[in-house]
Design a protein with these regions (language model features):
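Autoprocessing domains of the Hint superfamily
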Residues: 1-143
Length: 143
């Protein structure tokens, strides 16, 4: 899934999908691009959109607006942005703890090249050299 910033189209699996312009050199990847999924974690079922981020060494399942269990805890991807570089992503991330939802670094910040930035009052992290792809998984049951 690649962003063509000139035509503002997102190409995935041979399909071209328009991308909403958020601000200069930044395009919001809309939720409709990913599959609507129901995710069951710890007796709670969330409805959201499933993404997979792949690198040369790792693969991460991410759920927009819901939570995914990782070795770092439960993470919520609030929004996914693409910068003007085709394979750079900016992730807005929170961690679900016993004390509620709190901002945190992306769990893979020791794996990717991550730079902290602030966009629209959110803590954001630029994750380099990754590719965002839509996954076809229907349901994850972690119980």
């Amino acid at each position: 899934m690649l962003i063509d910033k000139d035509s503002k189209l997102l190409r995935a699996n041979g399909k071209e999908i328009a991308v909403k312009d958020v601000k200069e050199n930044m395009f919001l990847i809309q939720n409709e691009l990913a599959n609507n999924v129901h995710v069951k974690l710890n007796d709670f079922t969330y409805t959201g959109y499933l993404y997979t981020i792949t690198t040369a060494n790792r693969e991460y399942k991410l759920f927009s607006g819901t939570h995914v269990l990782t070795s770092q805890g439960y993470l919520s991807i609030e929004k996914i942005y693409s910068l003007n570089t085709k394979l750079d992503l900016m992730l807005l991330v929170t961690r679900n703890t016993d004390y509620g939802i709190m901002s945190t670094y992306f769990a893979s910040n020791r794996i990717f090249a991550v730079e902290r930035e602030v966009v629209e009052d959110y803590e954001c992290y630029k994750v380099s050299n990754v590719q965002l792809v839509v996954d076809s998984l229907i349901c994850v049951d972690n119980s």
